[in-house]
Amino acid sequence: MALSPRDTTKRRAQRVRTRLRKVANGRPRLSVFRSAKNIYAQVIDDERGVTLAAASSLEGEKKDKGSDKDAAARVGALVAQRAIEKGVKDVVFDRGGYLYHGRVKALADAAREAGLNF
């Protein structure tokens, strides 16, 4: 029985998260969600089930396009700034089954430059 592309993506993302939980050692998870028009990131404490910091490309000026690498870099810097304000410096990067390329990579690089360690 063949799986649909959507089911395959969901299973891959779940597999990645399961591996991350084994490696995390209590560190929060920087989770990325990418849509066709926007990108979202949040720092999640899985032990308590709480979102510590979040940012998306919907924030800010409406005229800016939210689907390019510049928007992803802004989101990465913003979520890193908010996480550091909450006292979180070390995280585990959860790319959510997306390839580490393009917007996902731009978000991760900006978060690293803003001070998050992963």
Curated annotation (Swiss-Prot):
Keywords: Ribonucleoprotein, Ribosomal protein, RNA-binding, rRNA-binding. It holds the Pfam family Ribosomal_L18p. InterPro entries: Ribosomal_uL18_bac-type, Ribosomal_uL18_bac/euk. It comes from the Bacteria. GO terms for biological process: translation. The keyword Ribosomal protein applies. Belongs to the universal ribosomal protein uL18 family. Part of the 50S ribosomal subunit; part of the 5S rRNA/L5/L18/L25 subcomplex. Contacts the 5S and 23S rRNAs. This is one of the proteins that bind and probably mediate the attachment of the 5S RNA into the large ribosomal subunit, where it forms part of the central protuberance. NCBIfam families: L18_bact (TIGR00060). This is Large ribosomal subunit protein uL18. It comes from Phenylobacterium zucineum (strain HLK1). The lineage of its organism: Bacteria, Pseudomonadati, Pseudomonadota, Alphaproteobacteria, Caulobacterales.
